[in-house]
Amino acid sequence: MQLPSFLDVYRGLISTSSISSSDPSWDQGNQAVIEKLSDWFAALGFDVDVTEVEPGKYNLLAQKGQGEGGLLLAGHSDTVPFDQGRWSFDPHQLTEKDNKFYGLGTADMKGFFAFIYEAAKRMDWKGQNKPLYVLATCDEETTMLGARHFSAHTPFKPDYCIIGEPTSLVPVRGHKGHVANVVRVTGKSGHSSDPSLGVNAIEIMHEVLFALMQLRDTLIKQYHNPGFAIPSPTLNLGHIHGGDSANRICGCCELHYDVRPLPGISLDGLDNLLRGALKEVEAKWPGRIEIVPLHEPIPGYECQHDHPFIHGIEELCGTPSQTVNYCTEAPFLQQLCPTLVLGPGSIDQAHQPDEFLAFDFIDPTIDVLSKAMRKYCF
């Protein structure tokens, strides 16, 4: 049987829609793309296991070789939604133009599996003494469901893991986490001509905002990591809405905010800080302040800076490792083994119209993956 080419696999990935979204009208399953990956890797001699994590949401684990340890190459099979009116190309068709591949998922990050496939296809597997694993997860773009499930249930522990998010082939050894909450203040509406008739939710929210800004200053003073370009946690007041008319006492006001904690800050500890910051306001206005998460929190992540794995991958890439501010599945896979983020394409193209991956990444990425397989599986 003739095996599909790198380009065949790349086209197949991009043409198979696998959008995940918190908006049910956009959210899709990823079964079709997982089935394609299953067929392709099985044809290369991998043992393939597909797990339905939730209805319509699947993880794939492909294994080549037996034994303990080995290398895990991981990525997510889903993409974000797209705005058709802002794309110059069909998002679900791989378009080649100006030495670039255009399409949804070319960089972030379904396309990475085509690189793994091609490197594995070219590899001479004689002498392999440790397994190679390929993990394709679901719902990274929303809840990190696939990575959370895999790290909690997998029966094995590889020696090392590489997640193929777009890093321009620069190894990433750490990133901040992400916590996003809603603060909902419930007041009591009434006619503005008599303030005593109601409780103004905007005025209570003013006190909430002051408390959160004080917390922001505390976080900056209390936590510092010089390995990050922005060395402290950030707290951003991102969205606020309250009231419906100038002549009504505001009955409800909502604030959306996020915090990006440094690695090492526990999510429980951060939650205690956030709730502690609002304790006095809540005591003053009992039953009127509610804190609700917008999504499950993601912890910060950092691979031990002097770990041999970092030095080994830096040597393969010829590039020093770095830290970044965006989030990946690394905090969850790091629970299993030392983990780095390394993949083709630029993060600047992620979640953007006309997402693309430059042809310049093709050969270097296949080369780095081939060398990593050889180094950690032989």
From Swiss-Prot:
How is this protein annotated for GO cellular component? cytoplasm
Which Pfam families is this protein grouped with? M20_dimer, Peptidase_M20
One Gene Ontology term from the biological process aspect of the record: L-arginine biosynthetic process
Q: Where in the cell is it found?
A: Cytoplasm
Where Zn(2+) 1 binds, per the record, is at: 76, 108, 165
Which CDD domains does this chain map to? Answer: M20_ArgE
Cofactor(s) essential for the protein:
Zn(2+); Co(2+); glutathione
Q: Which InterPro entries match?
A: AcOrn-deacetyl, ArgE/DapE_CS, Bact_exopeptidase_dim_dom, Peptidase_M20, Peptidase_M20_dimer, Peptidase_M20A
Keyword Oxidoreductase listed:
no
Q: In which pathway does it act?
A: Amino-acid biosynthesis; L-arginine biosynthesis; L-ornithine from N(2)-acetyl-L-ornithine (linear): step 1/1
Query: What is the stated purpose of this protein?
Result: Catalyzes the hydrolysis of the amide bond of N(2)-acetylated L-amino acids. Cleaves the acetyl group from N-acetyl-L-ornithine to form L-ornithine, an intermediate in L-arginine biosynthesis pathway, and a branchpoint in the synthesis of polyamines.
Family membership: Belongs to the peptidase M20A family. ArgE subfamily.
User: How is this protein organized at the quaternary level?
Assistant: Homodimer.
Q: What is this protein called?
A: Acetylornithine deacetylase
Q: What species does this protein belong to?
A: Vibrio vulnificus (strain CMCP6)
The record's gene field reads argE
